[in-house]
Swiss-Prot record:
This is Aspartate--tRNA(Asp/Asn) ligase. Its EC number is 6.1.1.23. Aspartyl-tRNA synthetase with relaxed tRNA specificity since it is able to aspartylate not only its cognate tRNA(Asp) but also tRNA(Asn). Reaction proceeds in two steps: L-aspartate is first activated by ATP to form Asp-AMP and then transferred to the acceptor end of tRNA(Asp/Asn). SUPFAM superfamilies: Class II aaRS and biotin synthetases (SSF55681), GAD domain-like (SSF55261), Nucleic acid-binding proteins (SSF50249). It is found in: Cytoplasm. It comes from Endomicrobium trichonymphae.
Amino acid sequence: MKRSGYCGDIRESSIGKEIAVCGWVHSRRDHGGVIFIDLRDREGILQIVFQPENKEIFEAAEKLRSEYVIAVKGWVRNRPFGTLNTNMSTGNVELVAVELKILNTSPGLPFEISDYIDTSEELRLKYRYLDLRRPNLQKNFVMRHKISKEIRNFLNEEGFLEIETPFLTKSTPEGARDFLVPSRLHHGNFFALPQSPQLFKQILMSAGFDKYYQIVRCFRDEDLRADRQPEFTQVDVEMSFVDEEDVMVVIERMLARVFKMTLNLDIKMPFERMPYSEAMLRFGSDKPDTRFEVEIKDFSRELKNSGFSVFSSVISKGGIVRGLCIPKGASFSRSEIAGLTKFVGEYGAKGLVWMKITDTGADSNIVKYFKEYEIRVFISKLNAKSGDLIVFLADEEKTVAQGLGALRLKVGRESGLIDKNKFNFLWVVDFPLMEWDKEEQRWQALHHPFTLPKDADSLTKENAGRAKAKAYDVVLNGIELGGGSIRIHKSGIQKKIFNILDISDESAEKKFGFLLKALTYGAPPHGGAALGFDRLCALISGEDSIREVIAFPKTQKAVDPLSNAPAAVSDNHLKELGLQQIEN
């Protein structure tokens, strides 16, 4: 029996036609001596009717159970009056079976094949082949395909070349740990799986390819946070003879195309450009969610001579004081406010100062330490109203920004202030080139060490903390979709950066010598970007977790319950690789 169409594609236009469909038994019902089967395939569900008049296939249909794989031939007809199902795209029609073939059977299921299941993620991933049959996940992967197709179409039309870069490459650990692959032919030596194609795409620009792209798998052996994967996919782009605006415009147009073709949304361009310092001040984050108007305000200047010693002493030591208004937060109980204090404590804050705004001013056990005009300044700058709660943090700038930034998002989510129908894009620009690592007592590149400084000629180790990078991150609704930079294309500047980062000439040559040499042979000015493809797919599909748009994801412990990877290998295999296992 040859399939002539998909279950989910059958409509009134097929009425009176004989068709054949294949799929999985989604459900079975017996009504008044008639058997009804909901047959499911990739495109949807079609109701199949087995009538007792056709004794042979009726008896066969009685044996059908959930997830049996069958092929059915029959005639399409209108559903009888009163039995239409407006929740299904095929809800006006049904197939009256005249032939049935059972292609495979299935035992009892560990969970129901439904979009609404109450089961552990571990179990879902163990039986991922069943989990992936759920209609919502099927839709997610159809959407993922559409997104990759539109990205490729756009970049191809713009003159980009899709070029693959190596998966077996050299370990250059500057950031997350590499996944290492031992060499069988060269004992004691290892390949590394790439964290990104960064160095190779720069070399492709040096080779004269002008515009490159790749939708590429990347690997990072890092401690997994809430929604990270050890292997992930990114959209990788690089261009020659460009500046920051050139790259950002291409990425904007690509994203606008994707959102139009997938969600039929018209994305406003150009995206807002927001300096890093402004993002950290107003939103406490370098990936600000601008869908709601609650903003952080700085009061360090107004409070440097404050009678409240907690504030004035912090400011005198070089710290800052910033505040946030929580709409209608005056109704919070002391225990709820204590919960907020505990929350910001997770970001290093030592305490949370608060005031409840009333019709007559402010109410708190610390109000007495402030002059009346200071209270008015708080209320005015924070645009606070009666019934609101204003909170303050006093500490070093990074702690205050992170604490209030996280609290702002918590308030936005829990108070229903975020408009989930909005898609607010923006670029964060003017990043610091480097940040000081207190533990290692050295400068670290904020993005990566191949980013071009805004004023490379005047950069020294002494002024590195003030240097700005030609870097840019694209943010959507508080999520960093990706980022990029203009790269260093002269070996002398690259060596200077390595020197400031305390990477010795010997170490730089050992790790990056092939790049440094390529830069000496007439490398053009170039720049690019990389976008998190999994994250983009999750956002467009309306999913909170990227695991819902990755076919075979790992758990938070970096384990695949389906295949039980990672797994031990035999001693013989280790011996071939020149390795041996040692006891912990």
